[in-house]
Amino acid sequence: MKPFLAIIFCFLILGVDSQRWFQFMKEAGQGSTDMWRAYSDMREANWKNSDKYFHARGNYDAAKRGPGGAWAAKVISDAREGIQRFTGRGAADSRADQFANKWGRSGKDPNHFRPAGLPSKY
C-alpha cells in the first residue's frame, strides 16, 4: 500500500508523468547523495566561513542530476533551514544559507562562495 501511495504522490503532487517517474526518483536519490557528500565534506574540512560554499556546491551537484535532483536539493535545504531556525539559529544566517542554496540550484558556480585557502580537495 505504501509504494502505491508514493507512486500516486509522484503523479499528482509532483507532476511527474508516467514515463519519467522512475528517472525522477533515481535523480532524487542521487541528488540526496550529492547533498550528503557536501555536508560530509563540510564537516571534514571544518573550514571557517565555508558553509555557504558547501551549501551551494551540494545544491549545484544535486540540481545537475535533473528535476529529481533539484527537487531533492530544495526539500533537503528547506528542511535543514527550517530545523535550524526552529532551534534558534539566526534568521540572517538562514537567509544567507538559502541564498547560497538557490544559487547552486540555479546552476551558478558554487566557487563564488569558496573561502580563500580552502584545500583544493573540496
From Swiss-Prot:
Region of interest: Disordered: 100-122
Main location: secreted
Subcellular location: Secreted
Pfam families on file: SAA (PF00277)
Any Gene Ontology CC annotation: high-density lipoprotein particle
Family: Belongs to the SAA family.
Name under which the protein is recorded: Serum amyloid A-3 protein
